[in-house]
């Protein structure tokens, strides 16, 4: 998916009279990739923590430092350490920290990686800033704390259970992937995720 324009909120602007050629050369795009998931070993490889798992896999494949948040060049990877309903608080704190550190000319782009019930397992979709949280409490929290138009999303399909009962759905999203599903995640789904992330990064830089 080609992204032609970045939302205005993601671009740090400055009066034209204040911008010279040296300023333009110093402008940097800083990307923060935030993987959603619940904390603790009980939720490792659970459907609702697929975003966190995917970002962790990406860090390993790209030889990122083992400390979190993990930074390599202008890309920072973050794993959620809070429960899903409070995901936005951590993202807001990270945002505040980066805003204090970077130049006013730099643009900070946020990408939230999360599981998505509305997509079948194996589907990966880039969503532009804005739009509904689609009932995802982690996305709802991020929108509340950072703003609805402030971040891209990469949705990772986990499919729906047959039942629409709230308790059944909760049990389903907290259940763990089986071995066949994990093979799919580690191959096809991870490959799709990397391709979408690469396309997004290229679009941000142009």
Curated annotation (Swiss-Prot):
Its EC number is 3.1.1.29. Keywords: Hydrolase, Mitochondrion, RNA-binding, tRNA-binding. TRNA binds at residues 83, 85, 137. It is found in: Mitochondrion. The keyword Lipid biosynthesis does not apply. Its main location: mitochondrion. It comes from the Eukaryota. The keyword tRNA-binding applies. The record marks 115 as: Stabilizes the basic form of H active site to accept a proton. The active site is at residue 48. GO terms for molecular function: peptidyl-tRNA hydrolase activity; tRNA binding. GO terms for cellular component: mitochondrial matrix. One of its GO terms (biological process) is mitochondrial translation. It catalyses: an N-acyl-L-alpha-aminoacyl-tRNA + H2O = an N-acyl-L-amino acid + a tRNA + H(+). NCBIfam families: pth. Belongs to the PTH family. Peptidyl-tRNA hydrolase involved in the recycling of tRNA-Lys from diacetyl-lysyl-tRNA-Lys and is important for mitochondrial function. This is Probable peptidyl-tRNA hydrolase.
């Amino acid at each position: 998916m080609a992204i032609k324009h970045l939302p205005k909120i993601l671009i740090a602007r400055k009066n034209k009279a204040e911008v010279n050629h040296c300023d333009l050369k110093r402008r940097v795009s800083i990307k923060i990739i935030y993987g959603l998931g619940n904390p603790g070993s009980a939720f490792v490889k659970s459907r609702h923590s697929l975003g966190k798992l995917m970002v962790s896999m990406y860090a390993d494949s790209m030889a990122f430092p083992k400390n979190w948040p993990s930074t390599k060049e202008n890309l920072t990877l973050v794993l959620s350490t809070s429960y899903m309903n409070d995901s936005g608080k951590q993202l807001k704190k990270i945002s505040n920290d980066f805003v204090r550190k970077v130049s006013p000319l730099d643009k900070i782009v946020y990408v939230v990686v999360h599981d998505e019930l509305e997509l079948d397992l194996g589907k990966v979709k880039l969503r532009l800033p804005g739009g509904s949280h689609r009932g995802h409490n982690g996305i709802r929290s991020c929108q509340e704390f950072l703003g609805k138009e402030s971040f891209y999303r990469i949705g990772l399909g986990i499919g729906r259970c047959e039942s629409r009962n709230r308790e059944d759905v909760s049990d389903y999203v907290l259940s763990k992937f089986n071995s066949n599903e994990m093979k799919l995640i580690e191959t096809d789904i991870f490959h799709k995720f990397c391709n979408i992330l690469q396309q997004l990064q290229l679009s941000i830089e142009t």
